Amino acid sequence: MGTLSVNQNKLQKRLRRLAGEAVADFNMIEEGDKVMVCLSGGKDSYTMLDVLMHLQKVAPIKFDIVAVNMDQKQPGFPEHVLPAYLKELGIEYHIVEKDTYSVVKELIPEGKTTCSLCSRLRRGTLYTFADEIGATKMALGHHRDDIVETFFLNMFFNGSLKAMPPKLRADDGRNVVIRPLAYCHEKDIQAYSDLKQFPIIPCNLCGSQENLQRQVVKDMLIDWERKTPGRTESIFRALQNVQPSQLADRNLFDFSNLRIDETAASRFVNVVNI
């Protein structure tokens, strides 16, 4: 890639700045961390690796990066692409081979979406591998739009108010997941991926499935954004401004013991009598 144009330079700086802010805001990376960057071969994970490698050069702390891809034995998966790319970058990398493709095809009926089971199997394998190599953080490439979409998916289909946190301790307690692109827009990531000409590997297992719930939600948000620009950004800000007393979750707020403040009542009476 040659010299960047003014707009391309702004795009690169914006992605680096937003990722840096997310890392700082949530204390994602600390001195001496070994960050396992999970690469799928898609635009998001390539961009994440690119941004983290820059951050590694300019950050005031020292941390290591190791790239990891999971070969799930999908038919037609180009096994040479990622090793060639990562060798050229000159960073440590591992290819974890596990045939989850056959498991998914066996358990999921034809025509049904495979994403949920596929991601669970992949996540479990990567958690185990992170522990094996001594990784202290596991970086995933989810961006701001993914987080907002997940919020609506959980609300519409699971009856819960939750999304994807920028930083998460896994249920096993052994892994901390970070999402450095949490503040980044998907459209910027797509533009940067096109600019850098990353060697994208399509997902043959689920990439062509129609009517996925996530795609329905994505289309809804795109339509909202078209009609009311800035709405998606406002929704993301709302996830950072939760007020438990204004919801109805008794586990988050103690409604049972909510009483009038007698001292406040007496102060009001005194003010009225003055």
Swiss-Prot record:
Q: Which UniProt keywords apply?
A: 4Fe-4S, ATP-binding, Cytoplasm, Iron, Iron-sulfur, Magnesium, Metal-binding, Nucleotide-binding, RNA-binding, Transferase, tRNA processing, tRNA-binding
List the catalytic activities from the record: cytidine(32) in tRNA + S-sulfanyl-L-cysteinyl-[cysteine desulfurase] + AH2 + ATP = 2-thiocytidine(32) in tRNA + L-cysteinyl-[cysteine desulfurase] + A + AMP + diphosphate + H(+)
On the tree of life, the source organism's domain of life is: Bacteria
Question: Where is the motif (PP-loop motif)?
Answer: 40-45
Quick one: signal sequence residues? none
Cofactor(s) needed: Mg(2+); [4Fe-4S] cluster
Binding, [4Fe-4S] cluster: C115, C118, C206
Q: Give the cofactor note text.
A: Binds 1 [4Fe-4S] cluster per subunit. The cluster is chelated by three Cys residues, the fourth Fe has a free coordination site that may bind a sulfur atom transferred from the persulfide of IscS.
Pfam families from the xrefs?
ATP_bind_3
Q: What is its EC number?
A: 2.8.1.-
Q: What pathway annotation does it carry? A: tRNA modification
This entry's Gene Ontology molecular function terms read: 4 iron, 4 sulfur cluster binding; ATP binding; magnesium ion binding; sulfurtransferase activity; tRNA binding
Q: Does the keyword Signal apply?
A: no
Where does this protein reside within or beyond the cell?
Answer: Cytoplasm
Gene Ontology cellular-component annotations: cytoplasm
GO annotation terms (biological process): tRNA thio-modification
Biological function: Catalyzes the ATP-dependent 2-thiolation of cytidine in position 32 of tRNA, to form 2-thiocytidine (s(2)C32). The sulfur atoms are provided by the cysteine/cysteine desulfurase (IscS) system.
Self-association state and partner proteins as the record states:
Homodimer.
In terms of HAMAP family, this protein maps to:
TtcA
PANTHER family given in the database record: AMINOTRAN_5 DOMAIN-CONTAINING PROTEIN, SULFURTRANSFERASE-RELATED
Q: Which family does it belong to?
A: Belongs to the TtcA family.
Q: What else is known?
A: The thiolation reaction likely consists of two steps: a first activation step by ATP to form an adenylated intermediate of the target base of tRNA, and a second nucleophilic substitution step of the sulfur (S) atom supplied by the hydrosulfide attached to the Fe-S cluster.
Q: Give the protein name, as stated in the record.
A: tRNA-cytidine(32) 2-sulfurtransferase
Specify the species: Pseudomonas savastanoi pv. phaseolicola (strain 1448A / Race 6)
